[in-house]
Structures are given as C-alpha cells and as structure tokens.
A protein has these predicted regions:
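Core catalytic lobe of class I
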Residues: 1-112, 128
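S-adenosyl-L-methionine
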Residues: 114-130
Length: 130
C-alpha cells in the first residue's frame, strides 16, 4: 500500500525559568540576517549525506545543528547531547567555540565522535597559509 513519507521534522525548544539568555554580548555570533531568516521562516535543509561515512543511520545535518546552536547558545556556553551518536553536535560546538558534553550508549559511535572532534580541532588550529 502506498504511503506518504514525512519530509519535515519539528524542532522543539524547552527551557527552565526565563527564556532570555543572559551572557556577554561579545559571545553572540549570530548575525542579524541569520536571526531574521531563521526565526521567521520554515527551514529548508538537505538531509545529512555522510551517514554511510560515519556508519550511523540517523544523523542530523550539520547546518541544522549550527543554526540551533547559534540561535540558542553563546560562545563558551555548555551544550549537553545525551544521545551524541556520531558526534555532530559536539563537532559543531567545537567549530563554534561552545563547550560540550556528549554521551552515547554505543562505544563505536563514541569513537567516531572523538575522531570527528579531533579532526575539527585540527582544522581550527591549521594555518590557512604560512
């Protein structure tokens, strides 16, 4: 029997206390156009294409994680991902100068996440030219 496949997902945001984020203005790295676009429209983001590369069946696209982190966190904030999988959230946290804690039940996924994070660190430290 034919069926329609969902082509969208919800992102839900929960908070305790006030939704206003308190922090240093210098640690805000979202620009005005990003904020305006991301808060007034549906997002159209291509599915993750590296699931086979990282041997994980359900990865979020890096662009989705980056948008969420830039919207709801500042630089140096701590982000906890209790189902870290192949480490997409932690990798993007490293890229955006957020502190992070990632856990997963799979030892293999944890190893993959560590490799991705280490690679991201190398990219940040490598000079573009000498």
């Amino acid at each position: 029997m034919p069926y329609l496949k969902y082509t969208w997902e919800f992102v839900e945001y929960f908070y305790k206390g006030s939704p206003k984020h308190i922090g240093n203005k210098e640690d805000i790295d979202i620009v005005g156009d990003e904020f305006k676009t991301w808060t007034t429209a549906k997002w159209s983001i291509a599915p993750e294409r590296n699931m086979k590369k990282y041997d994980h069946p359900a990865m979020f696209p890096e662009e989705l994680v980056e948008r969420i982190l830039k919207l709801f966190t500042y630089k140096n904030d701590i982000v906890y991902d209790p189902f870290s999988g192949a480490g997409t959230t932690c990798t993007i946290c490293e890229r955006l100068d957020r502190r992070y804690i990632g856990t997963d039940i799979s030892e293999q996924y944890c190893k993959t996440a560590i490799e991705r994070i280490e690679y991201e660190k190398c990219l940040k430290e490598a000079p573009l030219w000498e």
